[in-house]
Design a protein with these regions (language model features):
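Catalytic-core regions of hydrolytic enzymes
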Residues: 1-113, 125-136
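Active-site-adjacent mobile loop/cap segments within catalytic or ligand-binding domains
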Residues: 69, 119-213
Length: 213
């Protein structure tokens, strides 16, 4: 992971934030939270997706705090999967030898390749729409509490962790620890609590709009 302007580590900042989000969500009594990691270990990107799908997750949130060469760059941003990346991933999924249980627990092994491509594509498009809906809520809620990147805080990219075909997924860049101001904020417990609360409010709003199941 990235190293901050004053020596903090992204892996520590993001794990602390994830634990605080988990604590606040579980305090409501309405959520089961599964962490992709809960200590100082590296989990491969594909394994993170697999863990979310194995847990039958209704929502996947990947938390980051990256570094940039331009140390003036700061602010939070939200990423969801791009349309192009979606189509490429759908093709790759369809090509897998083991075709069973690939979409929301539905066995597609009896379907021909063309039908399976269509089913995977439809499932992923619906997932992308839900992801974009959550991203919109996140921009609103985070924007009330933190500085967002200018112009386009909701961005699109082909991050591997966003490619689960049946789990709405977002990647949250909390800020850039290469920027001293962002780094100082991200290492403060009070700020962490505030940001986690905005993430929890976003999740609550999302599930009101898109009830589980």
């Amino acid at each position: 992971g990235a190293v901050g302007a004053s020596g903090s580590y992204e892996k520590d900042v993001t794990l602390a934030m994830a634990r605080e989000v988990k604590r606040q969500l579980e305090t409501t009594g309405r959520y089961k939270v599964v962490m992709t990691r809960d200590d100082d270990v590296f989990v491969r990107l594909r394994d993170r997706i697999a863990k979310a799908r194995a847990a039958e997750a209704e929502l996947f949130v990947s938390i980051h705090a990256d570094a940039m060469r331009n140390r003036e760059t700061r602010g939070a941003s939200i990423y969801t999967l791009s349309e192009t990346a979606s189509d490429d991933e759908a093709a790759a999924l369809a090509a897998r030898e083991n075709r069973a249980d690939i979409i929301a627990g539905v066995d597609l092994s009896h379907e021909n390749k063309t039908v399976m491509n269509i089913l995977i594509d439809l499932a992923q498009r619906e997932t992308m729409n839900h992801s974009a809906s959550f991203a919109h809520i996140l921009v609103e809620e985070l924007g009330r509490e933190v500085q967002l990147v200018p112009l386009k805080p909701h961005r699109f990219a082909g991050f591997a962790v966003l490619k689960a075909p049946d789990v709405p997924s977002v990647l949250v860049e909390l800020g850039y620890i290469s920027n001293k101001a962002d780094e100082q904020l991200l290492t403060r417990p009070h700020y962490r609590t505030k940001v986690a609360a905005s993430l929890v409010r976003s999740i609550e709003r999302y599930f009101v709009k898109h009830p589980p199941g």
